[in-house]
Amino acid sequence: MELEFQQLDLRYERLRARQPARERRLLASLADAGQQMPIVVVIGPSAYVVVDGHKRVRCLRQLHRDTVAAVRWEMSEADALIFRQLLHTEATASALEQGWLLRALHEDHGLALDALARRFDRSVSWVSRRVSLVRKRPVPRLGWRFAE
């Protein structure tokens, strides 16, 4: 499906760190070859909630595109976030990014720490440590950047 940018809810963009070098490479690829992979969305109360593809959305906006190709997953936001994390296996996700996601699932979606541990095949202690790591740190509004 093709969606216009104003139809998108980017609330989870802040859970991922920005990596300017990777973003520049993606921008060049999108300018050269167009969008090759759709973003992933779920239906929210008033918009399509972007679960995966925030970097593609930012780059397509910079290229002044009007729409973005998207695929809709038929599941809850929480299930979609967990599935995306497991699908990508997130070898590159930092402990802070993992903590922000787990905190959002725990606080915003009401999932218990033991339920999160089972879903991610981790110990309750691991989940608790990740959540504690970010509990006193506010989630950045626009994402944070890794140094290059």
Regions found by a protein language model. Name each.
Residues Q36-V41, S128, R135-V139, E148:
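Short, proline-centered helix/strand-breaking motifs
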